[in-house]
Amino acid sequence: MPTLLERVRARRDRRLHEVRHLFRTDVSSRDRWFLGSSAGLIAAGVVAVSVRVLVDGSLVVGVAAAVVGVLLVRAAMLRPATPPHVHGLPGVPEPEVCPAPEPPDRGPFVVAVRWLGAALAFAVAFAPAAVVAVVLALLAVAAAPVLRDKAVLWRARRALRRALVAYEPRFVLGYGGYGGGPIHVGMWEPHLLASGDRGVIVGLRGHYCAELRAAIKPAMPWISTGSDVLGDMRGLTVPSVTTFFYVHNAPGHLKLMGIRSVRHVWLGHGDSDKAGSHHKRHLRYDVLVASGEAAIDRYTRHGVEIPRERFVLLGRPQSGEVLPAATPITEVARPTVLYAPTWTGNGKMTNFSSMYIADRILTALLEAGVDVVFRPHPVFLRDAYWAQRLTELNAILQADHDDPSTPGRHAWGEEAVRGWSVAECMNRSDALVSDVSSVVSDWLASAKPYLMVSMVHDLDAFAEAVPVAAGGYMVDRDLTGLPEVLDEMLHRDPLAEKRRQLKVQVLGEYEGDESARAFSAWVHEMAHTPMVRA
């Protein structure tokens, strides 16, 4: 059992964490802290001068030193933040280095300023004028590096704000992730820009700025925030901006959501039954864009009660690129099957990936007499273990592809993962094998059959926990009966009508590019509608 001292320390640490969190994410809390600390410093100065007057009647030196001291301590009592930088914004030169180099640590100077501020208050109250002058001079020396860095920050923010005012963006696409950017940002940027309005991307991870931009090749200007995101965005949220969009569940987005003059809209990066599609953090958003009624039902099913009026149903704009089946699967002589396993998640609770048994799945597909398009989640390419594993899995398809005694014509590796979009992979395939993934929801637009591998639940619980599975064929993690299930899907397909019904629940009534056009029109409307809070 923890001691009393340990409990006190734990409570203190929790309170400090709460205060820091509010300072980083809440404008009103930050303003209150600023006013409170300023009032405290002024009060300390007044007390010191009053004591001085009582001691020897001297006023001029005490008042002058107190005023200068309060200003110096107020300006230099916190570490200076690293400045933001921007790429692709007219009027602002490209940075020479990305990410920007870390500035020198001013922590020791900040600590010195605080202690010297206390010493100055004592000196003003009791010490001779010469001592007051010495302490004040030391305070000025300690504050100088901090103030110099803060001046650099102020100039950077001012130049960026001026350029943004001239550019007149209507929306911000906030991104606090890292490796998933090519998928998450790339998924939505074209559809946001189709509104005809200008926007900017705000990235919260400066160390990934160069990597993300190289992979995404964004059409919008990219702002990489400094270490004080909320401070940057208070100045960079220019009057033309009405809406912030979010495609990722990064906790860092709370810093952006501290800006209350705009509306905050959740887009997500795919419709699935993973926790990221029904997170309690979504309660904070002003508007949630959902593809269909199934998305709203998902929140309710998981106890996340969000008022219905905060949802807007716009289908999946990306599904317009997915073509419907030209021929029923039962009439295709040699079907092509897309195997698209999801990634392994951030932990056990979010790990639904079938990659652990991918070799057995690929082998079963080859034995079923189909061609295979193997497109694992791109995150696997960045992990050393999975990169080696992918080499082994690709070799299975390579061997069958190169064997003159087999008719197999497969796609894998760079061609399938980076050369083709997800929609292209879908359009080249007649059936899908996946797990708990938004790929399945998008696949519904094709009306083609799909098989889902349940890595966590038994099959009865799987259909209940993941409703989209009801329109597909299912096997458990042991792949029990996989050959028979594949045969049923490829040669009889009794679930065709169920898929058509499920498509409306998941993707809405939209056909073709109707969802994309509805989304861009809605974005344009939001971009030109100022946010008014009660």
Question: For each predicted feature, which ranges?
Answer:
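Donor nucleotide-activated moiety binding/catalytic core segment of transferases
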Residues: 388-441
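Active-site and donor-binding regions of nucleotide-sugar-utilizing enzymes
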Residues: 174-318
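C-terminal amphipathic helix plus adjacent low-complexity
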Residues: 490-534
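Short acidic-hydrophobic, aromatic-tinged amphipathic segments that line or gate anion-handling sites
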Residues: 221-229, 313-315, 409-418, 470-488
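Catalytic binding pocket for nucleotide-activated donors in carbohydrate/polymer assembly enzymes
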Residues: 438-507
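A nucleotide-sugar donor-handling region in carbohydrate enzymes
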Residues: 138-154, 284-353
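N-terminal pre-catalytic "stem/leader" segment of glycosyltransferase-like enzymes
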Residues: 13-234, 533-534
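Conserved catalytic-core segment of nucleotide-activated headgroup transferases in glycan assembly
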Residues: 179-201, 319-398, 508-517, 534
